[in-house]
Amino acid sequence: EDVYKRQANGTFLKIENTPFDFKEFHEIGERINDDHEQLKLAGGYDHSFMVKDEEDQLVLYDKETGRKMTMTTTLPCIQVYTANFLSGGCNGKDGKPYENRDGVALEAQFLPNSIHIEKEPKVILRKGEEYEAVTTYRFEVE
């Protein structure tokens, strides 16, 4: 939840019956224009989702081609960002300019602002300490 309209404060919002409920497959953009305060603030999806220690924490699937990407991570969150502010600022394949929401970024991370949220893991790495996280992207065709 965003306390200052953009900063996470550690309050977790329920996703059931909201545009953030991806427990069942549906197109990412299917609900992106729904009347929801968080979508309006970000211009689309730019939100962290807490993940459980399961084999397939995030799955993208194209039912037309059968292409599938599965993501797993040892980090507690996956940030989903739907390129809400591209508006022709960079070019893609064959020089075609990318427009808003022409892509999606999936970023394994700690919860944003977790350094200030006591109940979340601290993200400070001190001199001499080591840290390891593993994120896997698996691609296949079904």
Spans of model-derived segments:
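Active-site pocket scaffolds in enzymes
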Residues: 15, 20-142
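Catalytic His-Asp segment of secreted/periplasmic serine-dependent ester chemistry enzymes
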Residues: 12
